[in-house]
């Protein structure tokens, strides 16, 4: 069977690519080499934390509408500006990151999480690791405030559920082995699915399996 888009990988980047393609009408297939119990790549083994620009609690409540007034009253979420995000990226990478890609990441971070929320991904404050108590109030530090419910495994499962609801097919135990090409054009993927070799045609292939 042929698809408009085949995505190799089923972690956060891969599934967001698949959801974005489906949003504009593409017929999408996702290939995950692991089983469903172990799938999701690095995403499964992370805490599900996602760094984003925000200008205060009102922004955070757009991402986390479950936040109560009582929780907000005893919490200082602070802010995390674009300049702080840029500084952190350049500090961590020792200025070896691509400036154009960093600008895309930083300037789109908040709207990307809003979009993920619209796709059904739920977020919560990282109370346990990123906040400490001062005079009875929780104070967040380090600019890392938001995590997906259920951590990495929860993020994987929420993304897969969102994709399935939208008709995106996910094949587990499907390892992409090679690209099919016609001249300089990629036309599909060679896959080993549960021990059987298959060739899957695609107008576009997204490689998102190397996190």
Feature locations, PLM:
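Beta1/beta-strand and adjacent pyrophosphate-binding region of the FAD-binding site
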Residues: 1-13, 29
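Glycine-/small-residue-rich beta->alpha transition segments that form the dinucleotide
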Residues: 34, 202-204, 208-211
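Gly/Ala-rich phosphate-binding loop of Rossmann-like dinucleotide-binding domains
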Residues: 18, 22
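N-terminal glycine-rich dinucleotide-binding loop that anchors FAD/FMN and/or NAD(P) in oxidoreductases
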Residues: 44-80
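Glycine-rich, N-terminal phosphate-binding loop of Rossmann-like dinucleotide-binding domains
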Residues: 10, 54, 209-210
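Glycine-rich FAD pyrophosphate-binding loop
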Residues: 23-43
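Conserved redox-cofactor binding core of oxidoreductases
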Residues: 39, 100-198
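Core beta-strand elements of the Rossmann-like FAD/NAD(P) dinucleotide-binding domain
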Residues: 1-3, 193-204
């Amino acid at each position: 069977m042929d698809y408009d888009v085949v995505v190799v990988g089923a972690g956060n980047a891969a599934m967001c690519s698949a959801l974005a393609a489906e949003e504009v009408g593409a017929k999408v297939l996702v290939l995950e080499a692991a089983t469903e119990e172990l799938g999701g790549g690095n995403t499964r083994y992370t805490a599900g934390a996602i760094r984003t620009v925000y200008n205060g609690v009102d922004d955070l409540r757009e991402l986390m509408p479950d936040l109560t007034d009582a929780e907000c009253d005893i919490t200082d979420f602070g802010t995390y500006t674009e300049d702080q995000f840029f500084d952190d990226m350049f500090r961590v990478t020792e200025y070896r990151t691509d400036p154009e890609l960093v600008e895309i990441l930083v300037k789109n971070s908040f709207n990307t999480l809003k979009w993920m929320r619209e796709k059904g991904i739920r977020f919560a404050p990282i109370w346990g690791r990123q906040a400490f108590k001062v005079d009875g109030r929780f104070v967040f530090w380090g600019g890392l405030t938001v995590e997906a419910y259920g951590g990495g495994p929860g993020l994987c499962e929420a993304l897969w559920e969102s994709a399935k609801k939208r008709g995106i097919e996910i094949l587990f135990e499907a390892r992409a082995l090679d690209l099919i090409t016609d001249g300089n054009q990629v036309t599909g993927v060679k896959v080993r699915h549960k021990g059987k070799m298959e060739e899957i045609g695609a107008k576009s292939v997204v490689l998102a399996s190397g996190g």
